[in-house]
């Protein structure tokens, strides 16, 4: 089954136009526009390459059929060429299937402790480190925008910005978008003197980050901006000035804080980026019932019973309850080895999309 010619022609024309734009030095004077064009080009590249392979295979098949009428050696090639054409048509159909429009986006990720007190905060910090190590494996940059630590060095809450450094169509969101929800841990807490296994939980929220704050309509009159003395790690002198920023979006009640940059101006800019990401997600929730259902699957209350995944330390086991994924390599997972799990989640999501289409 082949894609409509007009749709393919439009994509080929767009790909060629983007190729010309990217070759023009003038485009790269605007880093934002250049990155947007680069990401779209990267998204179209496999479609164009697969289509060209398909056209070549179709030509070979047609020639083999014609020549095979008089030459058995050409006729023998027909079944293999037919299989190649079928395979390429399936690949092209998959590439042309609607995909998440945010897959190329960077993200804002929040980790929050829940039931379990100090142990929950320590586990929240373990989750944050897990995502940081995963990002490092992929060459992504991570910035801790805000953090509130517990007495033992855990995270009551933390906000991370995770950004890719390239123009891949499969960006940070495409890999980490399934992480939103309640994560449950079973282990012996450091505060447990009797050696008993306890269960606690931490929550994760993930938002695609708009490339520009201006993409999201934010009325300055809807904001209350407070500044206060930072307790973060923003550098020398950070505790002697009111450099931390708290922004409250009055219509929604969303509160964003940022204190780890060196200046009040930088903290405000970062906080506005996080606010834009959260408002964008909220708007998409309200515009789509499916998005609302997806967001409802993220953390609403950090309740141990509402979990998407369990981390069992005594058995070195991780279990994702949405897809019945189990593995006994928890130590490696916490060190950022998440791709097998993420591949399984992406495959399940793709299958669900195909079934619903």
UniProtKB/Swiss-Prot annotation:
Top-level taxon: Bacteria
GO MF: translation release factor activity, codon specific
InterPro entries, sorted: PCRF, Pep_chain_release_fac_I, Pep_chain_release_fac_I_sf, Prokaryotic/Mito_RF, RF-1
Stated name of the protein: Peptide chain release factor 1
Lineage, opening ranks: Bacteria, Bacillati, Actinomycetota, Actinomycetes, Mycobacteriales
HAMAP family for this protein: Rel_fac_1
Localization terms from the record: Cytoplasm
PANTHER family documented for this protein: LD18447P
GO cellular component term of the entry, any: cytoplasm
Processing and modification events after translation: Methylated by PrmC. Methylation increases the termination efficiency of RF1.
Organism: Mycobacterium sp. (strain KMS)
Function: Peptide chain release factor 1 directs the termination of translation in response to the peptide chain termination codons UAG and UAA.
Tagged with keyword Protein biosynthesis: yes
Chain positions found as N5-methylglutamine: 236
Gene3D superfamilies for the chain: 3.30.160.20, 3.30.70.1660, 6.10.140.1950
UniProt record similarity statement: Belongs to the prokaryotic/mitochondrial release factor family.
Pfam families the UniProt entry points to: PCRF (PF03462), RF-1 (PF00472)
Gene that specifies this protein: prfA
Keywords assigned: Cytoplasm, Methylation, Protein biosynthesis
Signal peptide: none
